[in-house]
Design a protein with these regions (language model features):
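N-terminal hydrophobic/helix-forming segments and targeting peptides
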Residues: 1-180
């Protein structure tokens, strides 16, 4: 563990929780996909989860299980080939549930597919597009404002296809047989 991340005298449980969070944080996960499965597998090391999967298209009350989304890589490059945005460095940079894309776009088109938080100019927002097929990136407002006119290469290596919604169930035995 890096020194200085936790105060002296912090309990072992707190240290373990912190290490678990450090392990889980980098995993890109959404409501479906391999990131959810990877997260649940790690959590199974700590608690006995029962894993369930529901196929895409299944109706559950007033909701339909969406297609499964997985992402492998994404970036924005400038005309010189420099990566300005890199999913491998920060998975917040991709609009969650983005469709795959690999093309060159103008700054105006890029801006039309970019989410920012002008009121928090140095924050990268978390945005999703579960129910409207689209592609996009999330940048800090400052970073977007610094982009010059020109052509940009946008690349998102993702898939959106029939699959499953995966979830974990953990049963905590109580003092009565009631369940909620």
């Amino acid at each position: 563990m890096q020194s200085g991340l936790l105060a002296e005298g912090v309990s072992d449980t707190s240290q373990e929780m912190f290490q678990l969070i450090r392990k889980l944080y980098p995993i890109c996960r959404s409501i479906t996909g391999d990131g959810v499965r990877e997260t649940l597998k790690i959590l199974q090391e700590y608690i006995p989860l029962t894993i369930h999967e529901i196929p895409s298209g299944t109706e559950v009350f007033d909701w339909t299980i969406p297609k499964e989304w997985n992402i492998r890589d994404a970036y924005i490059k400038n005309a010189n080939g420099e990566k300005l945005v890199d999913f491998q460095k920060c998975n917040l940079h991709v609009l969650n549930y983005s469709l795959p894309i690999n093309k060159k776009v103008s700054l105006d088109e890029l801006k039309a597919h970019t989410c920012t938080l002008p009121e928090r100019p140095d924050w990268i927002p978390y945005r999703t597009s579960y129910y409207k097929e689209n592609w996009g990136f999330c940048l800090s407002y400052d970073q977007l404002s610094s982009l010059a006119d020109g052509e940009y290469e946008v690349f998102i290596d993702s898939s959106l296809q029939d699959g499953h919604l995966t979830y974990g169930e953990y049963f905590v035995k109580g003092q009565t047989d009631d369940e909620f």
